[in-house]
Amino acid sequence: MIADIINPATLGFILVAVMLFAIFVGFPISFTLIFLGFVFGYLGFGPLVFYLMTLQFSMVMTEQALAAVPLFVFMGIMMEQAGLMERLFSSVQLMLARVRGSLYYAVLFVSVIFAAATGIVGASVTILGIMAAKSMNKSKYDVRLAAGTITAGGTLGILIPPSIMLVVMGPIMEIPVTDLFAAAIIPGILLALLYAGYTTLRCWQNPSLGPVLPEEMRATSMKQVWIEFFLGLVPPAALVFAALGSILFGFATPTEAAGCGAMGAMLLALAYKKLTFNKLQEALVKTLEITALIMVLVAASNFFGSVFSRLGTPMVLTDFLLGLEVNKYFILFIVMAMIFLLGWPLEWVPIVLIIIPIILPLIESLGFNLTWFAILVAVNLQTAWLSPPVALSAYFLKGVVPEWDLKDIYIGMMQFMVLQIVGLILIIIFPQLVLWLPTLIYGQ
C-alpha cells in the first residue's frame, strides 16, 4: 500500500492540491471529488474506502434537514415564475415615489424579501436587474450606485434565512439549522441598513444620484397606494415571514415550514392568476435540477472530507498552526482571506462543502463559536461576490442590463464591498450581533 511509503497526512495534502487544480481547470466538481476521494482513499487505507463512500452517500440522502432544500428552492422559483417579486417592487415603488432615492430603497426592500424566498444569488440579482434597471434608467438614476445597490441586495440571498446555503451548512458543521437562521437575521438586517444608509447619504450629498420619480411613475391617488400595499406587498412578505417565524419560534421544523412555504407560493400564484401548467412544470424541473446538483455535491464532498480526515491531514494542519503561537485572530484572518480569495472564482457550494470541513477542526481547536464562524463565512462569501476581478454578480447584472457598462457596474459594486467589510469587522468585534438572538430564542 502506498501509505507505507508516503505518510498518509502528506497524501492528504497532495489530495487537496490535485482537487483544487482539477476544479480550477474546469473538471465537474462532484465527479472530481468522488474520483479523487476514491483513488486517494484506496491508496491510503485500502478497501475500506468502498464502505466509506456508501456510508457517506447514504447519510446525506437520509438527512432530514436537507429535505428542506427542494421545498425552499421550489418556493422561490414559484414566486419568481408567478411575478410576485415584480408586483412587490411596483408596490414599494409607488409608496415611496415622492422620496428621493426611492428606487434604491425599493430594491433593497425587495431584495430582503426575495433573498429570504430564494436564497439563490444569481436569481436575485437577475430578477432585481430586470425589475429595477428600466425604472432607474427612466428616472435618470446614477448607474454606478444603481448597479451597486442591485448586486449588493442580490447577494443577501446567501445570508438572510431561509438561505439555502445555511440549510446545507448546518449538517456539514453539525449546527442546528434553526440556530443558523436565528444567527443570520441581525447581520442580514445590519448589512441592509448599511446599504440604505449609504444610499441615503449619497443622495443627500448629491440629489441628482436619485431624483424624485416623475409624475407618470407615481400613484394617482392614495387609494391606489393602499390597494398596491395590500395586494402587492402584504401577501408575499407575509408568506416569507410566516415560513421563517414558524421555524424560529419552534412551531415547525425547517422542512415543515419549507413545505408550507412551497404550498403558499402556489396558492399566491393561483390567487394572482399566474399559475399555469407550463409554469408549474418549469418550476418543478428547475427545482429538480438545482436539488440534484446540491445533493450530489453534498454527498460527494462528505465522502471527500471523510477520506481527507481519515488520512489525518486536518490534525497535522491544526497542530502546525496552533504550534506557531500566534494570536488566534491572526489565524482567523488567514482563514477568512483564503475563503475570500476562493470566493472569487467559485460558487459557495464547493467552498462550504469542501473547504469548511477541512478547516473546521482548526476553528474548534481555537475555541471560536461555530455558529458565529458560519455567519462570518456567509458574509465573507457575500463580499467575494462583490469583488473584482471575477465578481459573478456583475456578469449576472450585465446579462440582463446590457446597456450598463461593466466598468460602471464594477465601480458601483466596490462601494458596497467596502460596506461588506465594515459589516464583517463589526461582526468580528461584536459577536453578540450573531449570538444574541439564538441565545434569546433557544437559550443556548
Name the predicted role of every residue range.
Residues L20-I29, G76-E80, V110-G122, I150-I158, ...:
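Transmembrane alpha-helix interface/packing and boundary motifs in multi-pass membrane proteins
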Residues A9-L20, V25-F45, A67-F74, I189-Y195, ...:
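Hydrophobic mid-bilayer segments of alpha-helices in multi-pass membrane transport proteins
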Residues Q93-V168, W348-V377:
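Hydrophobic transmembrane alpha-helices that form the pore/transport pathway of multi-pass ion
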